[in-house]
Amino acid sequence: MSHSVIKVSASAMEQMKQSYAGSLTPAVPQGAVFQAKPPGCTITAYRSGKVLFQGKNAGTEAARWGTAEAPKAKKTVKKAADPLYAPPAGIASMSVIGSDEVGTGDYFGPITVACAYADKTKLSLMKELGVKDSKDLKDPQIIEIAKLLIKTIPYSLLVLKNEKYNQMQEKGMSQGKMKALLHNQAISNLLRKMNGVKPEAILIDQFAEPGIYFKHLSGRDIVKEKTFFSTKAESIHLSVAAASIIARYSFLIEMDKLSREAGMTIPKGAGPHVDEAAAKLIINKGEGALRTFTKLHFANTQKAKRLVERKRS
């Protein structure tokens, strides 16, 4: 049986737990934080930060969350990245469309997907504007840089709001397929905007193996030519870093809108503070409000309902 092991932060582990909310097992092995069994894979997350993926889809699931650690014995246990879709040498200095998403692990708020075209002649300017991995930037910096970027480079942005997200999820669509559809559409939109200008490459921040990504798009017009995938793609090309900044900027705007609508601050993430906020929203606006504010299938929904019951009893 194939397996992969990755190391993640506590916050990333919490996001993973929420993502697999529908397939969590009631009991967990000793030393584990959670165990989930999505199709073709058993996932066990340990307090040490290590996450073990086992089964025929181990490589696919592990690739959503990070790079697997090098195996100590058998070299065949980790699925190698498909060389056909690995970024080419020298891509950092090429003219590239980069694509990334924000909001997939947040209980409140939409998923925002952005792609941005960074012409090789603009790379120095983008560095001067402060473009880098968005994880290293605070929200005020994101806002400042994004406002400059959207006036400087071609981009495309899509926002999947909660009500539509919940409709798609309830019809059986996985979050992975939603993301694939959004990335493909955003890239298609940007290529049309560029009026015939051809990028040297298209780089997608990898959330699934390329074969799975393209399978999600079966039956649709797929942008495939010169398309490459990599985890941590923000550090490979500035176009992906720019896309991430624009996507996060949009996410912040949407969260502000939700906060105004709710009459309270809507928090990011999926931790206990989010459960409390969701419980407060239920008390103030009714349980039905969750449909337009949250990703209903996350475990936070049931946790918030239990909090409300305790507060009312």
Swiss-Prot record:
Residues 94-310 form the RNase H type-2 domain. It is found in: Cytoplasm. Endonuclease that specifically degrades the RNA of RNA-DNA hybrids. Its main location: cytoplasm. GO terms for biological process: DNA replication, removal of RNA primer; mismatch repair. Its cofactor is Mn(2+); Mg(2+). One of its GO terms (molecular function) is RNA binding. Keywords: Cytoplasm, Endonuclease, Hydrolase, Magnesium, Metal-binding, Nuclease. This is Ribonuclease HIII. One of its GO terms (cellular component) is ribonuclease H2 complex. Manganese or magnesium. Binds 1 divalent metal ion per monomer in the absence of substrate. May bind a second metal ion after substrate binding. Belongs to the RNase HII family. RnhC subfamily. It holds the Pfam family RNase_HII. InterPro entries: RNase_HII/HIII (IPR001352), RNase_HII/HIII_dom (IPR024567), RNase_HIII (IPR004641), RNase_HIII_N (IPR024568), RNaseH-like_sf (IPR012337), RNaseH_sf (IPR036397), TBP_dom_sf (IPR012295). Its EC number is 3.1.26.4. A divalent metal cation binds at D100, E101, D205. It catalyses: Endonucleolytic cleavage to 5'-phosphomonoester. SUPFAM superfamilies: Ribonuclease H-like. Coiled coil: none annotated.
